[in-house]
Amino acid sequence: MSLSPALLADAGAAAAGAHGAGPGPVLAVASALALLGYAWVGLLRAPAAQGDAAVRRSVPPMALAWTAQFVALFIDISGYGLAAPGARFGFAPALSMTIWLVLTVYLIESRFLPLHSVRRVLAWLAAAAVLLAWTFPGESRPLAASPWAPLHWVLGLASYGLFGVAVLHAALMNRAEARLRQRQPGPGGLPLLQLERLTFRFVAAGVGVLSLAIFLGW
């Protein structure tokens, strides 16, 4: 029994299409879960007297969204399901990774500092970043010749995240300073001196990581 060349070509194209569409459903589910979780947190409102209770209610959806966004980023950037080995990269996944890193630092710091006032803002920013990365997943890039290329990309994204965290802290610092001048402690009582120290530390860390990324990519 022999198969015609046309039949073989059609079978090969179908197999390649099935392989290329592999990450589609998983990426869609992860992105949808992240969007739902962040939207839940963004829409969650409570009186000032119930601030801590509102934060506790937002922990499960925030954790679900944060994890789902990480899964979506891993599937998208790693190039899972691509016919050729390599990675997939673009502006939208880079922005989503940056927001995810900023949110990670916020989740850690919020356990020690009263930063609850920016929770809903970060949730909406993360939701927008997830939607952009889902809509524009980036272009496929074959594996680079240099073994340091993956580390170069990771460090570059990490530096963007650190700079994003520094910008967030600078905005919080300006807000705290304005309230201090008006003699209004404001919700959460943001510690101005701690925010100032953290801002400069994140800027210094971002410069150091970016310098290392440039050195490895030279």
Go through the PLM ranges and name each one.
Residues 1-26:
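Short, strongly hydrophobic alpha-helical membrane anchors
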Residues 179-218:
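A mid-sequence, solvent-exposed acidic-amphipathic segment
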Residues 29-34, 150-168:
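Alpha-helical transmembrane segments
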Residues 55-63, 93, 116-127:
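Cytoplasmic-side transmembrane-helix entry/capping segments in multi-pass membrane proteins
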Residues 28-50, 169:
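N-terminal signal-anchor/start-transfer transmembrane helix
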Residues 61-78, 128-133:
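A generic, lipid-embedded transmembrane alpha helix
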Residues 23-35, 86-99:
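Structural signature of hydrophobic alpha-helical transmembrane segments
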Residues 108-159:
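Hydrophobic alpha-helical segments and helix pairs
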